[in-house]
């Protein structure tokens, strides 16, 4: 399999395991961006606990799934988004205003669109989940 994006492969394997009804999934290779993305998903309750396993190569992550994930994906290329431009992106990517999150990488770290709006920072769109 050709690896286009580590984050894309991680989210696709999670989404496929969720559709199959699996309780956990192993993601490899691992990266800091994948771990931060999973932290945002865990904070909002879309996944359970996850554990990083160091195999002295690229690392693995074992994620506990809880059945709440409907869809997740990566936006490529990573478009620049200002604070005022977050709203059109939420309308385009998410099914409704109260449902789902867009994950941004900002100068203040990787966070969801609501936290970025509260902190008044823009950044690049990494992906979304709902």
UniProtKB/Swiss-Prot annotation:
PROSITE patterns with a match to the protein in the record: RIBOSOMAL_S8
Domain of life of the native organism: Eukaryota
GO molecular function, one term: structural constituent of ribosome
GO cellular component: cytoplasm; ribonucleoprotein complex; ribosome
InterPro entries, alphabetized: Ribosomal_uS8 (IPR000630), Ribosomal_uS8_CS (IPR047863), Ribosomal_uS8_sf (IPR035987)
Keyword Ribosomal protein: yes
Keywords of the record: Cytoplasm, Ribonucleoprotein, Ribosomal protein
Principal subcellular localisation of the protein: cytoplasm
Gene Ontology process terms (BP): translation
Localization per record: Cytoplasm
Record keyword Amino-acid biosynthesis present: no
Family: Belongs to the universal ribosomal protein uS8 family.
Name of the featured protein: Small ribosomal subunit protein uS8
The organism of origin for this protein: Daucus carota (Wild carrot)
Organism lineage: Eukaryota, Viridiplantae, Streptophyta, Embryophyta, Tracheophyta
């Amino acid at each position: 399999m050709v690896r286009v994006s580590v984050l894309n492969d991680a989210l696709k394997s999670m989404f496929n395991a969720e559709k199959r009804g699996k309780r956990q999934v192993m993601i490899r290779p691992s990266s800091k961006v994948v771990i931060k993305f999973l932290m945002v998903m865990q904070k909002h309750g879309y996944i359970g606990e996850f554990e990083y396993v160091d195999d002295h190569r690229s690392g693995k992550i074992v994620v506990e799934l809880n059945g709440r994930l409907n869809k997740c994906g990566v936006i490529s290329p990573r478009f620049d988004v200002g604070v005022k431009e977050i709203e059109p992106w939420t309308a385009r990517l998410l099914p409704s205003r109260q449902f789902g999150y867009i994950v941004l990488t900002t100068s203040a770290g990787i966070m969801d669109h609501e936290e970025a709006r509260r902190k008044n920072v823009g950044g690049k769109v990494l992906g979304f989940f709902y």
